[in-house]
Amino acid sequence: MGRKEMMVRDVPKMVFLISISFLLVSFINCKVMSKALYNRPWRGLVLSKIGKYKLDQLKLEILRQLETTISTKYNVSKQPVKNLTMNMTEFPQYYILAGPIQNYSITYLWFDFYSTQLRKPAKYVYSQYNHTAKTITFRPPPCGTVPSMTCLSEMLNVSKRNDTGEQGCGNFTTFNPMFFNVPRWNTKLYVGPTKVNVDSQTIYFLGLTALLLRYAQRNCTHSFYLVNAMSRNLFRVPKYINGTKLKNTMRKLKRKQAPVKEQFEKKAKKTQSTTTPYFSYTTSAALNVTTNVTYSITTAARRVSTSTIAYRPDSSFMKSIMATQLRDLATWVYTTLRYRQNPFCEPSRNRTAVSEFMKNTHVLIRNETPYTIYGTLDMSSLYYNETMFVENKTASDSNKTTPTSPSMGFQRTFIDPLWDYLDSLLFLDEIRNFSLRSPTYVNLTPPEHRRAVNLSTLNSLWWWLQ
């Protein structure tokens, strides 16, 4: 009987504890909901089902006004009748910047319209946010999702206009990511639903460039937004990059690309000094023969790498370059991806004909402002004047000015990364010619490619004089 009385007395306490727990849980949930509400791109009160339905219908109506048909060529799109402007009291949270954030003027960006509200894939619209008027202007049509070739093409079109507020970076230098001494292989990348045929050197270059230019924005806060936006179509670059790890990685790669030290030279000299030629005591002619033989043996035993063959009298090929030069070269390489996809790479294409990729890339050799499918690009930062020794005037470059002497002349030439890129095109052309001849000639040996020594070496490219 006493136990029942105690249980009856404990009932109010249990009810009290349960009610307190319920209030505490509801309070925590309210805080979580308010925090989630604060992070929404369209902020406001918690809507009912009817309110959410009306908001979704409003978004879909705006998207319907933005949608237009995009033609098959990426640089030509059907222009809408007008842009769409709406109020937005705060800067959006889901975006890809096309230029620096300018708090007292206009910021250019690709706005993620769907965000997380409609639970659909991101759909980016090129927009302008006015910080003074607190409005956002959509400039249709939307390019679609990222990654995709349509968004990459729109980013290249915007970079051609150069009206997003990007500025130069002065004399800021960075590492050279155009490696020449790398294994060569081809693969297919999915840029959204599109397959793109890419070689290994292009992947290494664009991937390392994305890291270097993202890190360079710490010093150049008004630069490299467009090329970093392009990189999001191929790579997932972290927002924050460890500078120490990046520098150590690039230095290791740089040492591997540098000329190989003559490790066998001392050993060869020691062997030569201890070895007594068999005919050294007879005649001078025999002495010359044995000396030549000994020299040829030491030369064969010494390792000769492709990186030891230079076209510059420098001790290292991987010198630092200007960050703006790296940006311009990366922009050019992104334009070439258009010609590495279908229908230009169909299996049923004529393999003996000139590829569209070669037709597009050859214009950079003779023209500093080449015309591309996205318009004219200014690549003048990739060239410079150099005084070079000219042995034969008729075979020299036609772009040189009047020489100061019969053996010297000024010549317009390329910076090191562009030279290595053109040399890789020569290597690809050699592989292409070998693959075309191998079915006919069974015992052909693969070509051994060495880096181009001078401009005359690149003349073997069929499109050099086009």
From Swiss-Prot:
UniProt key word Membrane = yes
Main location, first listed in the record: virion
Q: Which domain of life is it from?
A: Viruses
Where is this chain glycosylated?
75, 83, 87, 103, 130, 157, 162, 171, 219, 242, 288, 292, 350, 385, 392, 399, 433, 454
Which UniProt key words apply to this protein? Glycoprotein, Membrane, Signal, Virion
Q: Tell me where it resides.
A: Virion membrane
Q: How is it modified after translation?
A: N-glycosylated.
- Indicate the family of this protein: Belongs to the herpesviridae U47 family.
- This chain's protein is named Glycoprotein O
Species this protein is from: Human cytomegalovirus (strain AD169) (HHV-5)
